[in-house]
Every structure is written in C-alpha cells, then in structure tokens.
C-alpha cells in the first residue's frame, strides 16, 4: 500500500495572550473575526436576519425570535458551515468560554491555507500455479485401464479375457469363462429390470 501526504503548507500557528477586559475583545486572522462583540435584536427585518446569521448554530435558542422558523434555522446552519478556502479556516472561540479572571492565557489559532492532500494506491497481485495438479491428472488417466464393454444382449463367446486379468496367460481358456459370462449377463438383465421397474 502506497500512502503519500502533501504537507507543503503546514498550519500556521500564531499565539497571542489576552486578558478578558471587555466582551468586545477580538483578534483577527485571515480577515475573519474570532471574538464577537455583543449584538442586540432590532425590529428591522434586515438587521434581524443579519443578527441571526452572525450567530453560531449552537448559540441559537428558544429566546431568539427566528429560532422556530424552519427556513431561517436552515439558512443559519448552512451559513455556519460555509468557509472561504482562500482566506483559511480559523478555530473560533466564543467570548463565554474565556476565563472571567484577569489571568492571562494563551490563545492558539490555526490556519490551513492549502490543505492536506492524501493519495492512497493499493496494489496487489495473486499468482496461482496449477502445474502439479495437471501432471497428477495426466497420471490418473494413464493408470486407468479400459476394458471392453459387454452389453447384456451380446454373445459372450466373442469376448476373450484380457491377458492382464490372467496370471501369465494360464486362464486364457479357463473352464469357468463361459459360466462367468452367463452369470454376468444375468446380473445385468436383473439390474436393467430393476431400473425399468423404478
């Protein structure tokens, strides 16, 4: 498996120390505002929609006037996930999550300018050899002997036992040969009769 990651532009990290002096404290990164100043709802429809679109989806609650409107709620959520790829993505921290004391703390912002490119290639090959199996099957065919087929209706005198079945040709003209063929013919007739009856 081949995995390559293009990290030509790692996230640029900037650290800043701030103190919670007022609720309108903000630091900017790539033209975006990280902190938010407090806004108030006005009766104007345009100002109200701007207010709702500026809030994050988690901050919208029952007290907001447009939170129960499905279209406005969908618009707010879809606007919340839109980002500008050229300007970068900033990790936003809300004012409420900052400590209330005057103790300074570090704030770290991440900006991904080019992103991460991942290429994964999976190469596999399977080879199966069947040479030994073919040779074995050829040997099986060689070891099998083909005997003459005797039909039930045929004359047994026309068939002579093969030399390989006898002991050095001692039973070539055996006295039991005729009885053997007669018995075999009767057994075949019985078998054929059983097959027909079934």
Curated annotation (Swiss-Prot):
Biased segments, Acidic residues type: 153-166
GO biological process: viral genome replication
Keyword Glycoprotein: yes
Cofactors: Mg(2+)
Compositionally skewed regions (Low complexity) per UniProt: 17-33
Coiled-coil region list: none
Pfam families on file: Rota_NS26
Phosphoserine sites (modified residues): 67, 154, 156, 164, 166
Location of the region described as Disordered in the Swiss-Prot/TrEMBL record: 17-72, 127-167
Residues annotated for Mg(2+) binding in this entry: 92
Record GO cellular component, one term: host cell cytoplasm
PTM statement from Swiss-Prot or TrEMBL: O-glycosylated. Hyperphosphorylated on serine residues, when in dimeric form. Phosphorylation by host CK1 is required for the hyperphosphorylation of NSP5 dimer.
Assigned keywords, A-Z: Glycoprotein, Host cytoplasm, Magnesium, Metal-binding, Nucleotide-binding, Phosphoprotein, RNA-binding
Record's function text: Plays an essential role in the viral genome replication. Participates, together with NSP2, in the formation of viral factories (viroplasms), which are large inclusions in the host cytoplasm where replication intermediates are assembled and viral RNA replication takes place. Orchestrates the recruitment of viroplasmic proteins such as capsid proteins to these factories. Participates in the selective exclusion of host proteins from stress granules (SG) and P bodies (PB). Also participates in the sequestration of these remodeled organelles in viral factories.
Family recorded in the similarity comment: Belongs to the rotavirus NSP5 family.
UniProt name for this protein: Non-structural protein 5
Organism from which the protein derives: Rotavirus A (strain RVA/Cow/United Kingdom/UK/1975/G6P7[5])
